[in-house]
Amino acid sequence: MAEPDSVNEAKEKKKKLWKAVFAISGIMLTLVIYGLLQEKIMRVPYGLKKEYFKHSLFLVFCNRLTTSAVSAAALLASKKVLDPVAPVYKYCLISVTNILTTTCQYEALKYVSFPVQTLAKCAKMIPVMVWGTLIMQKKYRGFDYLVAFLVTLGCSVFILFPAGDDISPYNKGRENTVWGVSLMVGYLGFDGFTSTFQDKLFKGYNMEIHNQIFYTTICSSILSFTGLILQGHLLPAVDFVSRHRDCLFDIALLSTVATASQFFISYTIRTFGALTFAAIMTTRQLASIMLSCIWFSHPLSWEQCIGSVIVFGSLYAKTFVKKKSEKPPAAQELPRDEEAQPLKGNP
C-alpha cells in the first residue's frame, strides 16, 4: 500500500506544480503586458506627426465593455441566471468609483512614469485600512500599520527623488509634478473605497464573482460611454484610432489581457489562496517596473532604488509573516491588490 500512496502523492505534487506554473505564467504574462501597453498608449506618440492618445475614458469604456461581454458569456455557459443579486444602485456605486479610479490611473501616466505609478499603487494600504475601518469596522494589527508606514515611506522616497532625465512627454515638470501626484492620490482614495465596498458586497450577498463582474462592468460601460458623449471625446477617440491602426490594436490587446488576467487571478486565489497570490503580485509589480525601465529607458536614481527595496521588502515580509502565522485573523487581512479585484486588470 505504501508504494501506491507514494506514487499518488508524487502525481499530486506534479499536478500541483503544473497548476502553479499555469497560474504564475498567466498572471505574469497578462499583467506585465497590460502595464507596458498602458504606458505605451498614454505616453508614446503615434504616427508621423507624433500624436498622443489623450482619451483615457475611452480606454475605460473598451476595457469594461470587453469584460462585461466575457462575464456574460461565462454566466450563460455555466447556465447561471443573469439577474442581479444586489440592488442595482450598489453595482452602480462600485462602477462610478471604479471609473474614477481607472481614469485617474490612465491620466496620471501623462505626468508620471509607469514605474512611479506602479510603486505608488503599493501605498494603497493606508486608504484601504481607513475605508475598512469606516465601512467594515475592521481592526488591524500593529504589524499592518508598520508595513503600511514603510511602504508609504518607500513610495514617497521613490516619487520625491526622481532621476533627472526622466521627464513627462506632456509636461516639462519632473515626475513629482503636483498634478501627477494629485491624480495618484485620487486613484488611491477611490481604489481603496472600491475594494472595500466590493468586499462588503460579497459578504452581504451570496454572490457569484461573474455576477458582480457583469453588472459592475456593464454599468461602467454605460457610464463611461455617457461621459465620452458629454465631454465630446467619443468621436475624437474613434477618429484617432481610425487614423492610427496600431493604437487600435494596442487598445484591443489591452482590453483582452485585462479581461484574461481576471480569470488567472480568480483561478490562482481559488487554487492556492490569497497569500500565494500576494507574493505573485508583488513579484509581478517588481518585474513590471524593471521591464518598463528597460523598454522605455526610464533612469532610476539611487534614492529610487532604496525606495523600491523598502517597498518590496516590506510587502514580502508581510506575506511571509502571514504565511507563518498559525491563526491568521480573516477580519484583519487587508483586501487583495487592485488586480485581484474583479474590476481590475488594472491592472
From Swiss-Prot:
Q: Where is this region: Disordered?
A: 325-347
Residue ranges of the TM segments: 17-37, 57-77, 116-136, 143-163, 177-197, 218-238, 247-267, 293-313
Q: Where in the cell is it found?
A: Membrane
Keywords, alphabetical: Antiport, Membrane, Sugar transport, Transmembrane, Transmembrane helix, Transport
- Name the GO cellular-component terms: membrane
Q: Name one Pfam family in it.
A: UAA
Q: How does it sit in the membrane?
A: Multi-pass membrane protein
User: Which Gene Ontology MF annotations are present?
Assistant: antiporter activity
Q: Which family does it belong to?
A: Belongs to the nucleotide-sugar transporter family. UDP-galactose:UMP antiporter (TC 2.A.7.11) subfamily.
Task: Write out the function statement from the record.
Answer: Sugar transporter involved in the transport of nucleotide-sugars from cytoplasm into the Golgi and/or the endoplasmic reticulum.
This protein's name: UDP-galactose/UDP-glucose transporter 5
Name the gene behind this protein.
UTR5
